[in-house]
Amino acid sequence: MRLDQIGSNDTTDTLTNGVSSRRNQLLMDISSELGVASVDGAAEATLDKLAQIVNKAAPNYKPFGAVLSEALRDRLRSLFGAAGVKQQYIRDRVTNVWQLGEGWVASVLATLLLDTREGASSRGGDLAKLPTAAVQNKPEADKLIDAAVEVVAQLKGVAVALPSAGGAAGALWSIPPRSTPSPRRSPVPTACSPPPPASC
């Protein structure tokens, strides 16, 4: 399923459609990702509660741990290998070209992992929000990275734009005016809120 289809009241059970083997694997992946033996209470907790449990169990967690690092490495190789683009190139484009903070890097990487998956979501629609085909050169890679930045901005509720050449440092961004409250959604991964394993 897609990140925007996961709600704050979801649990590991609803995320795995009640299939015990998948739920158990998800719980093991969470523990492995966080680098802890187990996460007490994770099986029954809603995602809102799970975020609190995770912060307590692994207060020093920083993206990414063992599970997501491996998944990310494999996906980036598939997407960018032909163009010779490494993870550092993506980081540099986010921080140097877009002039966004380090926190955006993890969010963009997670978006490239989760939003380029092929197939249908178990909750309807396609898994992918971004192109799923491998890029062949640096300009194509830049276009895909930039699209991921825009997806992250949408999830964060801000507008961003590439700084003009020679312009002021920092991507141009603003918080759009609020009208009606939008439904709460699971946030893009941050150091305090690790993303769900890609198997979700």
Regions found by a protein language model. Name each.
Residues 1-200:
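4′-phosphopantetheine-dependent carrier domains
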